[in-house]
Design a protein with these regions (language model features):
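N-terminal amphipathic alpha-helix/helix-capping segment at the start of soluble metabolic enzymes
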Residues: 1-20, 85-89
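Hydrophobic faces of well-ordered beta-strands that scaffold small-molecule active sites
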Residues: 19-23, 48-50, 96-100, 125-127, ...
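Active-site beta->alpha loop and helix N-cap motifs at the rims of alpha/beta catalytic domains
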Residues: 47, 52-54, 63-128
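Catalytic beta/alpha-barrel core
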Residues: 73-76, 121-134, 148-157, 163, ...
């Protein structure tokens, strides 16, 4: 069992939902970010998703977009994130996931990134702009280093496509609650129920619901 799947299943076995918070790397500043990471880890986060800032975050709403813009202006980069993880190696009990877009990952060097993820304790990656049809070589590169490529499915994902993801996915499945971008909504969309029902029929992997959540 992949370590991320175990983190989520251990939470469920303890009678609770897994807590998987997201932080934009370097926000509001680098020191505060690592302090926030530690606070989340100490206070029960099962997995922490680290947002890699990018200048054109097409899946993100204004909150994440503005945070990314600020930290990029302050000099945050994937190289600095990896160095920070190296400096904090062994510090976190929570599973660690990088969430970001292909452009900075390719610029960094995907094979190099996968190897360094293994070295610093990153167990998964979420790449919203990497479609299933193009993902196989990147998934295999990550798998060699014990890093899961987390699949994203949503209201418009057919059961047939979900089953394709089910055959190759590790860790957990990221279920997008709404069409559109990240950010708080006043309520959860009614379509979430049917999306989760379809996902439960297709996946043996645990499901994590994200996008548009305003409370646990």
């Amino acid at each position: 069992m992949h370590i991320l799947e175990k983190k989520v299943r251990d939470a469920v076995a303890a009678g609770r939902y897994a807590l998987i918070p997201f932080l934009t790397a370097g926000y509001p500043d680098e020191d505060a970010f690592w302090e926030d990471m530690g606070d989340l880890d100490k206070n029960g986060a099962d997995v922490i998703e680290i947002g890699v800032p990018f200048s054109d975050p097409v899946a993100d709403g204004p909150v994440v977009e503005n945070a990314s813009r600020q930290v990029l202006a302050d000099g945050m980069s994937l190289a600095r994130i990896m160095q920070g993880l190296r400096d904090h190696q062994g510090f976190f009990n929570a599973g660690l996931v990088l969430m970001g877009y292909m452009n900075p990952f390719l610029q960094y060097g995907f094979e190099k990134l996968a190897k360094e993820c293994e070295e610093v304790g990153v167990s998964g990656m979420i790449i919203p702009d990497l479609p299933y049809e193009e993902a196989a070589p990147y998934r295999e590169t990550l798998k060699k280093h014990g890093v899961a490529l987390i699949a994203l499915v949503g209201p418009n994902t057919s059961e047939e496509r979900m089953k394709l993801y089910a055959d190759v996915s590790e860790g957990y499945i990221y279920v997008v609650s709404v069409m559109g971008v990240t950010g708080e909504r006043s309520s959860v969309a009614p379509a979430v129920v049917s999306t989760m029902e379809r996902a439960r029929r297709c996946f043996r992997q645990p499901l994590a619901l994200g996008f548009g959540l305003c409370h646990p």
